[in-house]
């Protein structure tokens, strides 16, 4: 790859590189860059700009909050034709050397000029993990919410159908971020399951939607837990949604239990780099 020698130059950007990123969000003030804060986007920008030796525009599929993790976050970066010559192997090795150990680029794709990790996403999927038992989770503790009391999963599952479809999710949005902005979203899937991580049984809540509001998934989880604790019945979920009022919903669940699991794109748009 022939990298630009002048960091201040403006090259002709004829294509897009797309990176699939995983990270442990525990040490970061969220994904989005913030002055004076350590963020996932800031670390990615520093690493990619070091390799390309120029400033970049970086777009993500979804901005995760402080403490939230990702298995398959996607970012897009406009590049030159010459920069496309950098091989997949070189990208992965360089990013492994340049990124902190809690952030990894797991795959590199090329895409058309103008492709956006955010605006070309068809849907995004999150999973929230809960350890609802007396015993403290040990090896999985950084990625689950330890809820010491057992939850009625059947009751919580009965509330999930109310979440499906396109509707106003303002009740689950951080108040300040909803001012003057649209709060309608479409949820395609909301379901509970179980998994075993490091020998520990984990309750999972997976939700897929076209997009999500600030703190939306965590507030939905907090509301479902109220139902799982028998403080409310499953029909309450419908009342919360219809209220369009943050005070009507349950508390926001801790960030540590939430993981951004993936993004759905048109499969013809992304081609794995050679």
Language model segments and positions:
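Structured-RNA-binding interfaces characteristic of tRNA pseudouridine synthases
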Residues: 2-274
């Amino acid at each position: 790859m022939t990298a630009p020698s002048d960091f201040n130059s403006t090259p002709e950007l004829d294509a897009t590189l797309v990176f699939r990123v995983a990270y442990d969000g525990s040490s970061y003030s969220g994904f989005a860059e913030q002055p004076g804060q350590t963020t996932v986007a800031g670390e990615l920008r520093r690493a990619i700009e070091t390799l390309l030796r120029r400033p970049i525009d970086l777009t993500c599929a979804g901005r995760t909050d402080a403490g939230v993790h990702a298995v398959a976050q996607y970012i897009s970066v406009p590049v030159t034709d010459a920069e496309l010559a950098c091989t997949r192997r070189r990208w992965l090795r360089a990013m492994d050397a340049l990124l902190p150990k809690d952030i990894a680029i797991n795959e590199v794709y090329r895409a058309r000029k103008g492709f956006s990790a955010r605006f070309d996403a068809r849907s995004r999927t999150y999973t929230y993990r809960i350890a609802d038992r007396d015993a403290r989770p040990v090896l999985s503790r950084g990625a689950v919410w330890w809820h010491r009391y057992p939850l009625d999963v059947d009751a919580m599952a009965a509330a999930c159908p109310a979440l499906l479809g396109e509707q106003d999710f303002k009740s689950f949005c951080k108040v300040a971020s909803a001012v003057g902005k649209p709060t309608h979203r479409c949820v395609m899937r909301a379901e509970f399951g179980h998994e075993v991580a490091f020998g520990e049984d984990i309750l999972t809540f997976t939700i897929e939607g076209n997009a999500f509001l600030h703190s939306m998934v965590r507030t939905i989880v907090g509301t479902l837990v109220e139902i799982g604790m028998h403080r409310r019945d499953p029909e309450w979920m419908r009342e919360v949604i219809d209220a369009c009022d943050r005070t009507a919903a349950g508390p926001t669940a801790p960030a540590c239990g939430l993981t951004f699991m993936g993004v759905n794109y048109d499969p013809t748009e992304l081609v794995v780099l050679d």
